[in-house]
Amino acid sequence: MSYQQQQCKQPCQPPPVCPTPKCPEPCPPPKCPEPCPPPKCPQPCPPQQCQQKYPPVTPSPPCQSKYPPKSK
């Protein structure tokens, strides 16, 4: 028997079945970047004069302008 014949006698092995590729694990959620430090507050404005802080109260308009007369 030649060497080739002996080899042929061995039952052929079926080709190895490739296992179905496993889905890669989902990516971990991206790490949030560290939140920005709160912006530094600018120095508070010097206190304004009262007049600017509290504007003068405007007198309420007369009733006529509030409720115009109905057009006939």
UniProtKB/Swiss-Prot annotation:
Coiled coil: none annotated. GO terms for biological process: antibacterial humoral response; defense response to Gram-positive bacterium; host-mediated regulation of intestinal microbiota composition. Induction: During squamous differentiation of epidermal keratinocytes. Its main location: secreted. It comes from the Eukaryota. Keywords: Antibiotic, Antimicrobial, Cytoplasmic vesicle, Disulfide bond, Lipid-binding, Repeat, Secreted. Residues 1-11 have a biased composition (Low complexity). Sequence repeats lie at residues 21-29, 30-38, 39-47. GO terms for molecular function: lipid binding. Signal peptide: none annotated. Residues 1-20, 42-72 are annotated as: Disordered. Expressed in intestine; selectively expressed in goblet cells. One of its GO terms (cellular component) is transport vesicle. Forms five pairs of intrachain disulfide bonds. It is found in: Secreted; Secreted, Extracellular space; Cytoplasmic vesicle, Secretory vesicle. The keyword Secreted applies. Residues 21-47 are annotated as: 3 X 9 AA tandem repeats of P-K-C-P-[EQ]-P-C-P-P. Gut bactericidal protein that selectively kills Gram-positive bacteria by binding to negatively charged lipids on bacterial membranes, leading to bacterial membrane permeabilization and disruption. Specifically binds lipids bearing negatively charged headgroups, such as phosphatidic acid, phosphatidylserine (PS), cardiolipin (CL), and phosphatidylinositol phosphates, but not to zwitterionic or neutral lipids. Induced by type-2 cytokines in response to helminth infection and is required to protect against helminth-induced bacterial invasion of intestinal tissue. Belongs to the cornifin (SPRR) family. This is Small proline-rich protein 2A. It comes from Homo sapiens.
